[in-house]
């Protein structure tokens, strides 16, 4: 995340912080608090320091602590002009919270919109368990949750910026560095798939489900906009393994950004209602549809491995992959019958869903 933050600092945030919180404000703050908070009291020799850091003799590689040495861009005088220097944990937290929130919202809305226009099976709107105003409710919950999920996530990024990770930038080509980099993609998927499975299964414990996970299961059949429609603590808990991985295992910094983007794409894809993959090893859209319909199956994120080992795997019905049967009344009636059984089992009488297309059960109390 230091790469993203340095780009933001160079093009926007250095100037913004220098204008909003100039170093001259330090004159009004006791020295004790300046040291405690890591504030910048202003450099009379900032030009000399800037020239030293930008010189050809400076080692231009990512340091253990962000903000000490430039990597992508040369520093300028504004890099030293704010009360909050680049290396300030307060500044790092605030900057990353804004960046992650904006990027998260844009990625969610952009990816889900593309999926809705080009991929999403809109016959789902006719399903008897599609809710009234469902898509608007999905978007509202996701947009309101993403800033809070970002706030919970940012401390992990701050840890990485301050040396508490095994993220790296330099590839050791002489010692099979490229091969190791490729292997990291597979180990990341393997590790995080297990982590999501464990977190997701815990979220289905009755008390935890009612407190945190129930909002996401309001959607019995999904649109792509359901992908990030979580209680913020729920969404954060399911993402923890993505942050634990680089703390304990090596991961290239660019791969880290690619994988985080991929995870968001994948999350949208498994909510798009297009059952393209019937691979028994892949936890695709069909498997996740089974999870939303029947609650107690297919907790994994990418593969079916952990569900098989944990005894929670349920193979999607063949009717999901047959265009003639998928939207047939008989198929939907069978789904509704089983769905109602699981709603009663998991939620009891606490069911406030109002359905769009089922006049007999518009509100199921």
From Swiss-Prot:
Record text on subunit structure and interactions: Interacts with ERG28.
Note: Present with 36200 molecules/cell in log phase SD medium.
BP GO annotations: ergosterol biosynthetic process; sterol biosynthetic process
Use in biotech settings: Engineered yeast lacking this enzyme have an increased tolerance to the phamaceutical aescin (escine), and could therefore be useful in the production of aescin at industrial scale.
Sequence motif Histidine box-1, location on chain: 200-204
Cytoplasmic-side positions: 1-92, 162-242
InterPro entries on file: Fatty_acid_hydroxylase, Sterol_Desaturase_Related
Domains as described in the record: The histidine box domains may contain the active site and/or be involved in metal ion binding.
Residue ranges annotated as Lumenal topological domain: 114-140, 264-365
Chain ranges of the Fatty acid hydroxylase domain: 187-311
Essential cofactor(s): Fe cation
Cross-link Glycyl lysine isopeptide (Lys-Gly) (interchain with G-Cter in ubiquitin) mapped to chain: 324, 344
Subcellular location: Endoplasmic reticulum membrane
Traits of the deletion mutant: Abolishes the production of ergosterol. Resistance to aescin.
A GO term for molecular function: C-5 sterol desaturase activity
Enzyme Commission (EC) number: 1.14.19.20
Protein's recorded name: Delta(7)-sterol 5(6)-desaturase ERG3
Range of residues in the leader sequence: none
Residue numbers covered by motif Histidine box-2: 213-217
Function, as annotated: The third module or late pathway involves the ergosterol synthesis itself through consecutive reactions that mainly occur in the endoplasmic reticulum (ER) membrane. Firstly, the squalene synthase ERG9 catalyzes the condensation of 2 farnesyl pyrophosphate moieties to form squalene, which is the precursor of all steroids.
Protein family (similarity comment): Belongs to the sterol desaturase family.
Primary location group: endoplasmic reticulum
């Amino acid at each position: 995340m230091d790469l993203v933050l340095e780009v933001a600092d160079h093009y926007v945030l250095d100037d913004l912080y220098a204008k909003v919180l100039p170093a001259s404000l330090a004159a009004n703050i006791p020295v004790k608090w300046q040291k405690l908070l890591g504030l910048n009291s202003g450099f009379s020799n900032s030009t000399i320091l800037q020239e030293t850091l930008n010189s050809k003799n400076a080692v231009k590689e990512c340091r253990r602590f962000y903000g000490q040495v430039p990597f992508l861009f040369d520093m300028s005088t504004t890099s030293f002009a704010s009360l909050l220097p680049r290396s300030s944990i307060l500044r790092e937290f605030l900057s990353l919270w804004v960046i992650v929130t904006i990027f998260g919202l844009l990625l969610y809305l952009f990816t889900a919109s593309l999926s809705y226009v080009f991929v999403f099976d809109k016959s789902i709107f006719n399903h008897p368990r599609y809710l009234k105003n469902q898509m608007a409710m999905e978007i509202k919950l996701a947009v309101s949750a993403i800033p809070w999920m970002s706030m919970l996530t940012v401390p992990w990024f701050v840890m990485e910026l301050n040396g508490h990770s095994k993220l790296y930038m330099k590839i050791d080509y002489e010692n099979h560095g490229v091969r190791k980099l490729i292997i990291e993609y597979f180990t990341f998927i393997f590790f995080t798939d297990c982590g999501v499975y464990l977190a997701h299964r815990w979220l289905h414990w009755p008390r935890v489900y009612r407190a945190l996970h129930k909002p996401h299961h309001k959607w019995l059949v999904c649109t792509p906009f359901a992908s990030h429609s979580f209680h913020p603590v729920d969404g954060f808990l399911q993402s923890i393994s993505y942050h634990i991985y680089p703390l304990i295992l090596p991961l290239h910094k660019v791969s880290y950004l690619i994988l985080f983007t991929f995870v968001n794409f994948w999350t949208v894809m498994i909510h798009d209602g297009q059952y393209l993959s019937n691979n028994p090893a892949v936890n695709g859209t069909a498997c996740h549809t089974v999870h939303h319909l029947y609650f107690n199956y297919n907790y994994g994120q990418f593969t079916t491995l952990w569900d098989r080992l944990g005894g929670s795997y349920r193979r999607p019905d063949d009717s999901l992959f047959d265009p003639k049967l998928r939207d047939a009344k008989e198929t939907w009636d069978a789904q509704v019958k089983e769905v109602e059984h699981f709603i009663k089992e998991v939620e009891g009488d606490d069911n406030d869903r109002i359905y769009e297309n089922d006049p007999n059960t518009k509100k199921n109390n």
